[in-house]
């Protein structure tokens, strides 16, 4: 009888403990929770009266590093970390360095996303709402409205979850000594 009571107590304890655990994470939630690095080609569409389309490659690494390399229609590189953003425009021989006032780097956005009933993920940071959609278990598109109220849609392809990315690529090193460096 004592053994039976012990078994019942253990089963009740396990049942209560299991009931207190949150629901198991979806595959997408697990990806977001365990994401340490991300690499993908992207297509960025800025929708206004005349839509603008950009193509390039994104490399990002936790906790808050990102490198956006725009290849078309104009070359541009954007380096982000927790302190500043460097926008390098090789055609203009110019790099603009701006202190990062708001935490709106790629990983800050991803870590704050919450799953919605439609399966997408959303978060709002500094009055900007970001919406991420997954496809085949990987981030597929990120939408938001920019500060001029234009809808921006970034579609990812050839996405890699947690690839090895060397830290050095996130540091801006001028390729030409004749460029202007503008600090804002």
Curated annotation (Swiss-Prot):
It comes from the Bacteria. It is found in: Periplasm. GO terms for biological process: lipoprotein transport. CDD domains: LolA. Its main location: periplasm. PANTHER family: OUTER-MEMBRANE LIPOPROTEIN CARRIER PROTEIN (PTHR35869:SF1). Participates in the translocation of lipoproteins from the inner membrane to the outer membrane. Only forms a complex with a lipoprotein if the residue after the N-terminal Cys is not an aspartate (The Asp acts as a targeting signal to indicate that the lipoprotein should stay in the inner membrane). Belongs to the LolA family. NCBIfam families: PRK00031.2-1. This is Outer-membrane lipoprotein carrier protein. It comes from Helicobacter pylori (strain J99 / ATCC 700824) (Campylobacter pylori J99).
